[in-house]
């Protein structure tokens, strides 16, 4: 099961304390997943989802917060995907639309064209959070953080995009928007933003999983950076050692080695014998011991002498 499905499966278990909060969540779910159709003489409001638990949640919200009895219809495509439609018909559909603030009177259905959010229903932060939860259940998704940080809401209309954007910014979120195949996509790529949304929606178990993955990724990235840094330092040390050995061998080849002062010859002999040792390790082998900078100074002096020939 996907990380996104796990998130929705946790959200549908949340128990709200008031009808107003339930209405706010239902408003989000219906606005972003609902469609009005007239089929023969029947008017049907369908809220569509691929998740059966989300369909059950919407059914329960309609029953408990609005007092209507809807039905769940399962539609299967040519493949293995099934769609669950929570259907409210005729008077129940009108009651639902009025209860959620999409229309004010039954006759408004004759002119209804698209959903828009009545912000008067979202006058408190707790209602906005519930609305955000409902919107996510209908049109949201979040990627497994092990792969990448990405959460998005695929919004069906430009007007709803504005509504969702407004609610999000009022909750101090900073969404970004892109148009993908004619659909407005409100998205987040920051791990901090995604964690904030999970918190606002009430997905606390998923939030813990998200943070655990983030911590592991950060530890792994830190380890990789450290390893890369150590490898780079090792390459520098090896490169320097090669140059030093070449300078010493040049002096030996030209019979100039014995002209070096004894302190330089001592370091040169150690470098030839211990080519993979660090400057610090070479210095500890000298009598008396010499610090890293002192060894480096002597080897540079040898290189300068070799460069003259």
Q: Where in the sequence are the language-model features?
A:
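N-terminal low-complexity or simple alpha-helical regulatory segments
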Residues: 1-99, 120
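DNA-contacting interfaces and partner/effector-binding or oligomerization modules
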Residues: 56, 60-80, 87-211
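Short, hydrophobic/amphipathic alpha-helical patches that form generic packing surfaces
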Residues: 24-32, 130-138, 269
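Conserved phosphate/pyrophosphate-binding and hydrolysis machinery centered on Walker-type P-loop NTPases
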Residues: 48, 125, 154, 187, ...
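Short acidic, hydrophobic short linear motifs in intrinsically disordered regions
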Residues: 36-44, 146-148, 278-280
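Short, Lys/Arg-enriched C-terminal cap helix and immediately downstream tail that follows
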Residues: 304-309
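Short helix-coil junctions and helix-kink-helix linkers
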Residues: 47-49, 152-155, 285-290
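Extended mid-to-C-terminal alpha-helical interaction segments
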Residues: 200-297, 302
């Amino acid at each position: 099961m996907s990380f996104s499905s796990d998130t929705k499966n946790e959200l549908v278990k949340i128990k709200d304390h008031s009808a107003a909060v339930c209405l706010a969540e239902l408003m989000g779910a219906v606005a972003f997943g609902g469609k009005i159709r007239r089929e023969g003489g029947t008017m049907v409001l369908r809220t569509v989802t691929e998740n059966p638990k989300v369909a059950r949640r919407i059914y329960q919200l309609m029953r408990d917060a609005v007092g209507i009895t809807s039905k769940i219809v399962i539609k299967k495509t040519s493949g293995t995907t099934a769609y669950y439609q929570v259907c409210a018909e005729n008077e129940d559909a009108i009651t639902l639309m009025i209860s959620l603030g999409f229309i004010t009177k039954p006759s408004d259905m004759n002119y209804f064209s698209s959903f828009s959010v009545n912000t008067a229903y979202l006058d408190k932060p707790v209602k906005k959070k519930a609305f955000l939860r409902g919107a996510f259940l209908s049109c949201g998704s979040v990627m497994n953080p092990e792969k990448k940080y990405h959460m998005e809401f695929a919004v069906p209309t430009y007007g709803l995009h504005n509504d969702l954007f407004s609610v999000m910014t009022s909750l101090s979120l900073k969404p970004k928007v892109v148009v993908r195949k004619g659909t407005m996509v409100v998205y987040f790529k920051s791990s901090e933003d995604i964690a904030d949304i999970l918190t606002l929606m009430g997905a606390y178990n998923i939030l813990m999983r998200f943070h655990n993955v983030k911590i592991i990724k950060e530890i792994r990235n830190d380890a990789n950076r450290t390893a890369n840094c150590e490898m780079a330092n090792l390459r520098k040390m090896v490169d320097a050692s090669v140059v030093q050995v070449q300078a010493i061998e040049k002096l030996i080849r030209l019979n100039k080695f014995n002209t070096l002062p004894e302190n330089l010859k001592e370091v040169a002999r150690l470098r030839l014998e211990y080519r993979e040792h660090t400057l610090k390790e070479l210095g500890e082998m000298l009598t008396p011991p010499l610090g890293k900078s002192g060894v480096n100074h002597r080897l540079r002096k040898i290189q300068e002498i070799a460069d003259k020939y």
